[in-house]
Structures are given as C-alpha cells and as structure tokens.
Amino acid sequence: METWHMTAHGRVQGVGYRAGCAQAAIALGVRGWVRNRADGTVEVMASGTIQQLEALRNWMQAGPPAAHVARVDVEPGQGKFEDFDLRPTL
C-alpha cells in the first residue's frame, strides 16, 4: 500500500473534476480525499496499490469531458484513510 499526493493543473474546477475524481477513486478501491484549492488546482491524497494509484492518476490526467488538464504532479504522500472523501476548498 502506497500513498500519493497528486495535484491537477489546468481547467479542473467548475467542470465536475472533483466529483468525477472521487467516483473514479471509489470505483478503483482507493482511499483518501480530494479537494479544490484556492489557486485553481485540485489536490488529491490517495492510498492504494501502485496499480490503483496509477489508474487514478491516468483518470486525473484525462479528467471529465469539460476539463482541460495541463499536468498532474505526483509526490509521496502520507496518511491512513478509511474511505474516500470530498473535502471543502482550501
């Protein structure tokens, strides 16, 4: 089990990205959280197998139809999670 901290850049707010990301994470069995950031990015802390995390990162790069994802930054994360939550904007 690994934990990744991922940040999506581009047109990722106001397009259903956060909710879609949560749905994808839950479908993949990933635990953690997603939230919008005041700087216009979407931040994810996700815990799962490497295969689950790579699949979520691939979803994040594609995003929902209305999104335009410029890039997704990935770095090691931390935390233990029971489920996957939508968090308020920070």
Swiss-Prot record:
The UniProt catalytic activity note for this protein reads:
an acyl phosphate + H2O = a carboxylate + phosphate + H(+)
Asked if the record carries the keyword Hydrolase, the reply is yes
PROSITE patterns in the record = ACYLPHOSPHATASE_2, ACYLPHOSPHATASE_3
Q: Report the InterPro entries cross-referenced here.
A: Acylphosphatase, Acylphosphatase-like_dom, Acylphosphatase-like_dom_sf, Acylphosphatase_CS
> Per UniProt, which keywords does this protein have?
Hydrolase
> Which family is annotated?
Belongs to the acylphosphatase family.
Q: What is the name attached to this protein's record?
A: Acylphosphatase
